[in-house]
Amino acid sequence: MKKFFYENGAPSGWRITFLTLLLLWCASLFFKNAVYQISFAALNLFFLAHLLYFKNYEILSEILKKTRFIAICFVCLVATLAISNLLNEAVISKKAWQSTLFFILRYGTIFLALCYFYKLKFFDQNAVFAFLFVGLGILSVSVIYQLVSSTDAIVFSSDSVRGGLSGSLSNRNILGLFMGFGLCLGAVAIRQPLALKFAALFLFAFFMIFSFSRAAWVGAFCALAFYGMLNLKSLNKKYLLFTVGFIALFAVLLALSPSFEQRLAALFSGDSSGRTVIWSYILEMAQQKPILGYGLGSYINLPGSPVLEHPEYNAPHNLFLEILLYSGVLGLIFYGAILFSVFKECIQSRQFGVLTLLIYLLIDCQFDHGAYLSKEALSLATILSFLAYRVRIER
């Protein structure tokens, strides 16, 4: 890490500033606070200032050429969303246009900024992973505090509907998203020492389980199963012992925790917590405006929306259905093309660790998080999309 602070043998103010901003942005992804808002704006401004000061227009042009497919799809997606907003002013949310602008700045320009500074060798993949672990570590401290002060109400409670770990966040599903991501990140990013790897996996798995986020459970299980199958030959006895120990812990928790047993039973019984009602409604409404949809944030303002009778049904809870509702089939095509391109890039460059993390996010977003307004999941997806393209960029 220290090498990135220097340029031509001397400390570089540009590099130190960038790494500080990158650390703040990566770490603040896991918290709903002003630091994230400030850091993503500062990162964008720093990118613009560096570009103009050093006149690195050729580097930016080269990056755009190497990422032209995903860039064109992103522009077309935003254009589709903007047209949909214009055609549906009566039902879009009050912050629809602001959210559309932030969609560009938080994800589009940040993606370019990461590619730009990576091309200049300001940081590497390990730095990104380290900064993400910093944020996850801080969040974990708040989870431990909640767990210590409310163990009976969470682990040994008989009410799994209102319980669950949330840490410093307001929502257990968001914590589940982060802890599941931390679990997968620990599996693919921590190589040595194994004691640190296993400790991180244990903590993130425990926190994920008691967030009671079933989407995170399913996503992490599928992603780690995929990663394990790819690395069967490299797994030794220590990994086998850890797996056996984890299964034993799982069985003990199942026996001792009524709330965990309830959530697991709900998962296997197919209890959707109202999601099937939401999804059926979206599919029905999408048939009326299939091409461009209803505009950003329109779900809560549409006639007969499930949220009118059930306030807890306040979001589409499915990435693809949200795209279909807000930007129609056209948006679905462009968004799907971006996803396909990123996954293809991972496979071609053999970045199966990044692919594992993408699989986790994609599965989780089929049940809990959306395509346009879920800044937590989308910020992580932006980082992973950059990592998928980094091999192409550095050629």
Tell where the protein language model's regions lie, with residue ranges.
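Transmembrane alpha-helices of multi-pass inner-membrane enzymes
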Residues: 19, 26, 42-50, 354-366, ...
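N-terminal signal-anchor transmembrane segment
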Residues: 1-55, 77-90, 361-363
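Membrane-interface helix-loop-helix junctions at transmembrane boundaries of multi-pass membrane enzymes
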Residues: 4-15, 51-71, 189-199, 231-241, ...
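Alpha-helical transmembrane segments of multi-pass inner-membrane proteins
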Residues: 109-112, 126-160, 167-233, 337, ...
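Hydrophobic, aromatic-rich transmembrane alpha-helices
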Residues: 2-5, 41-58, 181-190, 330-348, ...
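Long extracytoplasmic/lumenal interhelical loops at the membrane interface
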Residues: 266-280, 284, 288, 292-327
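A membrane-periplasm/extracellular boundary helix in multi-pass inner-membrane enzymes
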Residues: 231-270, 283-288, 296
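Aromatic-anchored transmembrane helix interface
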Residues: 72-76, 93-118, 127, 131, ...
